[in-house]
């Protein structure tokens, strides 16, 4: 068995069965199942779902969506990622799998917005996400570091 890695999940009935193992918080769990079912029906091959398999079973998952914003009502302007429904099965929590998923999203080098679940503020703080409060609700954002030492081909010519 190799080291677990993050991969884009296929939209199929096997993934649907794997999702049923996750017992999230109420309607949020159901919406992820319904979302996957809708993608199966529409034969949508561009899956927004990412996960980690361990021993042939899905143990952690998230949804990742590319969005655009004009700057209001929060501090991200332009293209960013929305990270939703990050969940790790109870027997695999506190082993770094949630962090692996978030680091995968960070590696795409876009700002990230997420809505923290109850009692997860410490997790997002540890991963350098900043809390943001707006009239519609609270969430966390992460911005990629800008490397000012990077020289483009045009600048070096």
Curated annotation (Swiss-Prot):
<dbReference type="InterPro" id="IPR016181">
    <property type="entry name" value="Acyl_CoA_acyltransferase"/>
</dbReference>
<dbReference type="Pfam" id="PF00583">
    <property type="entry name" value="Acetyltransf_1"/>
</dbReference>
<dbReference type="InterPro" id="IPR000182">
    <property type="entry name" value="GNAT_dom"/>
</dbReference>
<feature type="domain" description="N-acetyltransferase">
    <location>
        <begin position="9"/>
        <end position="147"/>
    </location>
</feature>
<protein>
    <recommendedName>
        <fullName>Uncharacterized N-acetyltransferase BALH_3551</fullName>
        <ecNumber>2.3.1.-</ecNumber>
    </recommendedName>
</protein>
<keyword id="KW-0808">Transferase</keyword>
<keyword id="KW-0012">Acyltransferase</keyword>
<dbReference type="InterPro" id="IPR017274">
    <property type="entry name" value="YlbP"/>
</dbReference>
<dbReference type="GO" id="GO:0016747">
    <property type="term" value="F:acyltransferase activity, transferring groups other than amino-acyl groups"/>
</dbReference>
């Amino acid at each position: 068995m190799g080291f677990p890695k993050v991969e884009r999940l296929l939209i199929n009935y096997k993934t649907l069965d794997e999702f049923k193992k996750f017992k999230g918080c109420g309607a949020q769990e159901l919406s992820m199942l319904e979302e996957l079912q809708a993608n199966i029906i529409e034969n949508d091959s561009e899956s927004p779902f990412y996960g980690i398999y361990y021993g042939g079973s899905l143990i952690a998952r998230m949804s990742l969506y590319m969005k655009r914003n004009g700057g209001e009502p929060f501090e991200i302007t332009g293209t960013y990622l929305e990270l939703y429904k990050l969940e790790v099965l109870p027997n695999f929590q506190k082993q770094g799998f949630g962090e692996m998923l978030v680091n995968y999203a960070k590696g795409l080098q876009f700002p990230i917005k997420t809505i923290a679940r109850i009692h997860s503020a410490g997790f997002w703080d540890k991963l350098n996400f900043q809390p943001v409060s707006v009239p519609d609700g609270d969430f966390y954002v992460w911005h990629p570091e800008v490397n000012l030492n990077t020289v483009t081909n045009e600048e070096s010519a």
